[in-house]
Amino acid sequence: MSQKILVLGNSNVDLIFRIPRFHHPGETILAENLVTAFGGKGANQAITSKQLGRKVIFMTKLGIDHYGESYLQYLIKKGIDQKWILRNRRLPTGMALIELTSKGENRIIASPGANGSLSARDLKLLSSVWKEANVFVAQLEIPV
C-alpha cells in the first residue's frame, strides 16, 4: 500500500534572475538571464512526493488570474488532484522574485497573494481525509 501524503502549502510563480553578484542599494545591474518557473515549497514537496509514487493530497490556494490558470494546468499535468486546489477571486497567485548569483547564493522576495488567504475554514474541507494520511507536511509559510 502506498503512503498517502497530505501537503498544506504554497504555490508561487518564481521569477528567477541570474545575476553576477548581489547589487548595492540604489544600484542597477543587468541580469544574465531570467527564468519563469512554477515553485513554492508546498507545491515542490507535493510534486516530488507524487513523482516518488506516493498518493498526494495537496491543499494550496491560487488566484483566478493568468498565472493561477497556468499553475493549475501544470499541477494537473504533474498528477496532482485539483480537488484541493482552492482559488481566490480577490488576490493574485503568489509570486517570488529570486536573485541567484553565479556562486549559487540567493535572495528571495515573496508576495504570498492567494496563499496568504488560506484559512482554518479551508482546512475544515480536509476533515474527510486527515485520517487517511500517513504523513502531513506543512512549510509554515501560510497563515494557518
Annotate each predicted stretch with a short phrase:
Residues M1-K61, H66-S70:
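Glycine-rich phosphate/adenosyl-contacting loop at the front of the ribokinase-like
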Residues T93-A96:
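Short alpha-helix plus adjacent loop in nuclease-associated cores
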Residues M1-S11, I57, K61, L72-R87, ...:
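Ribokinase/PfkB-type carbohydrate-kinase core domain
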